């Protein structure tokens, strides 16, 4: 197992699915030597498998976004105007990915930019801001039925970068390059709320919404927004109060590309266009914990695996970064050690009548 793997082409998307990371790389026409591939690597606390456990050649198609269903070991990718479902099958000591179904989920002249999948639905976003919701039915890890439920052709005026589905609230939330983040009712795709961000009232335009993450326990939404060639911020929004802003933190003075939220620790990992990984503690007032320099080139995507962070960069490198607490003893753990020591010392003294 290794902490760093060099692939043959730039990494555009990744998704952590149980003890695997699915990696989409490529970015060009296969006829000119740039292979577009979908690879599956094994993960453990000690690192990433040195070679993929399974691989799919994508020809001229560039996978740009991945979402998944960990409970079913199923994931879905955005390729051109298609959504393609795959499953990870374990046979003895070996695992492999195999294609379940390919669905034309965007119009022929559009590029599908992102998607989100749940056990009952698929939501897709396109390069022109088009938003669609499909119903899904699974049978024995295969898709038995797909139906278009609703389409909103004017959800956004620019590319939709990210979608989050919250089934229990019957809503979905989108982030777009048009500078807005919107909440929609799933059944009708009627817009319920729109939010945007500017660092100061003097600025003339909204920041691009790069990514969104949802904390279901605290009912909080996090948005990552950046200027075209400038600063990046994360804002915490209160879902109980209709997406009212709670606090904002400046992450960096350059463009950040993606983030992921660790629900176990309340920490966000953010990656930027100059090879940095920044950890943000979201408990209470947001604050930066640590900034790591992983390389010199843009890190395009990232996700937590436990407390470790998996990232993929445009210089072909797949990395596992240790937890920000790696090698440190927490105050709580130190207190437990001291307490146990005092108890043992007390028992020893009592037996030997030292005092």
At which residue positions do the language-model features occur?
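A short beta-strand motif characteristic of beta-propeller blades
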Residues: 1-5, 51-57, 96-106, 144-153, ...
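Repeated scaffold domains used in trafficking and secretory/extracellular systems
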Residues: 8-13, 59-70, 107-114, 158-163, ...
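Loop/turn segments within WD40 beta-propeller blades
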Residues: 16-19, 66-72, 114-120, 163-170, ...
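C-terminal single-pass membrane-anchor helix
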Residues: 325-355
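Beta-propeller domains
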Residues: 1-4, 20-56, 80-95, 138
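Conserved beta-strand element within WD40/beta-propeller blades
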Residues: 22-25, 30-31, 75-79, 122-126, ...
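WD40-repeat beta-propellers
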Residues: 33-35, 39-42, 83-88, 131-136, ...
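Juxtamembrane amphipathic/hinge helix adjacent to a transmembrane helix
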Residues: 278-329
């Amino acid at each position: 197992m290794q902490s760093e793997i060099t692939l043959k082409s730039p990494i555009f998307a990744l998704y952590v699915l149980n003890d695997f990371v699915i990696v989409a790389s490529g970015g060009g026409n296969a006829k000119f030597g740039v292979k577009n591939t979908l690879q599956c690597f094994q993960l453990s606390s000690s690192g990433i498998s040195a070679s993929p456990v399974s691989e799919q050649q994508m020809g001229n198609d560039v996978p740009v976004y991945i979402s998944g269903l960990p409970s079913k070991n199923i994931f879905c990718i955005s390729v051109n105007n298609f959504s393609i479902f795959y499953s990870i099958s374990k046979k003895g000591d070996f695992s492999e990915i195999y294609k379940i179904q390919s669905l034309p989920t965007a119009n022929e002249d559009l590029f599908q930019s992102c998607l989100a999948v749940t056990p009952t639905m698929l939501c897709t976003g396109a390069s022109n801001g088009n938003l669609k919701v499909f119903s899904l039915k699974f049978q024995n890890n295969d898709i038995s039925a797909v139906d278009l439920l609703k389409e909103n052709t004017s959800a956004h005026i620019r590319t939709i970068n990210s979608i989050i589905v919250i089934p229990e609230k019957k809503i979905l939330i989108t982030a777009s390059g048009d500078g807005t983040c919107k909440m929609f009712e799933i059944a009708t795709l009627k817009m319920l709320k729109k939010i945007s961000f500017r660092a100061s009232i003097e600025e003339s335009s909204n920041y691009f919404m790069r990514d969104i993450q949802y904390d279901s326990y605290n009912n909080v939404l996090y948005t990552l927004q950046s200027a075209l060639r400038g600063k990046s911020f994360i804002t915490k929004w209160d879902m109980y109060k209709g997406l009212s802003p709670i606090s904002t933190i400046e992450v960096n003075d350059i463009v950040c590309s993606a983030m992921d939220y660790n629900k176990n620790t309340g920490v966000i990992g953010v990656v930027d266009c100059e090879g940095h990984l920044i950890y943000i503690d979201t408990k209470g007032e947001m604050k930066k914990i640590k900034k790591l320099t992983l390389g010199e080139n843009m890190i395009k995507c990232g996700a937590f695996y436990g407390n470790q962070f998996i990232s993929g960069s445009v210089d072909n490198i797949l990395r596992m970064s240790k937890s920000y607490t790696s090698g440190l003893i927490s105050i709580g753990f130190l207190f437990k050690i001291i307490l146990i020591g005092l108890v043992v010392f007390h028992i020893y003294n009592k037996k030997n009548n030292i005092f």
